[in-house]
Amino acid sequence: MLKSNKHPRRIFLGHATRLVIAGAITPLTSPALAALPQARSLELDHTHTGERLSVVFAVGDRYVDDGLRTLNHFLRDHYSGEVGSIDPQLFDLLFETRRELGCTQPFEVISGYRCAATNTRLRNTGGGGVARQSLHMEGRAIDIRIDGVPLADVRDAAMSLQAGGVGFYPRSKFVHLDTGKVRYW
């Protein structure tokens, strides 16, 4: 039997260093992230795909890459399947809107990212309200509602944040949020 001439403290420090490095490389699981005090998460239901999602997208002032990728896929163009890159500030806006409302219900997503072809098709179908240079095509806009919360309350909460555009569409039953200039319609 070989005897190690390393001091027990050095052995311990070596193991501890390997664990710290492994922890930095291996991301925490979603439940572990959600338990962190500064975790920011979203709960979403997609009205067109039927998908549901609960995801941590940021902890403190850092975005969580896996959370952002998951959200990008969830908010893909549901007509074409194309996945866009969503502005992380849009997730902050959603998080703060829900916090302002003091509710825990998920957002119902009507529209997230749109490719140019989908945007053109929607403009040409006569539904109205689809901008030629829509921020949906840049991943900077989302159309949402919250079950059981009046649309006007969702609009007012988002407007109070002064963080981007807020469109109110009561006939179509959604509120548009974007990370463009502060404006309301």
What residue ranges belong to the model's regions?
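Short, solvent-exposed loop/turn and secondary-structure capping segments
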Residues: V55-V56, R121-R123, D156
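Catalytic cores and adjacent binding grooves of peptidoglycan-active enzymes
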Residues: L2-K3, A34-A35, R40-D45, G126-W185
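Acidic helix-start/capping segments at beta-turn-to-alpha-helix junctions
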Residues: P106-T120
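Extracytoplasmic/secreted envelope proteins and their assembly/folding machinery
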Residues: F91-F95, N119, L151, R155
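Cysteine-centered nucleophilic/redox motifs
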Residues: L93-R98, C115-T118, M137, I144
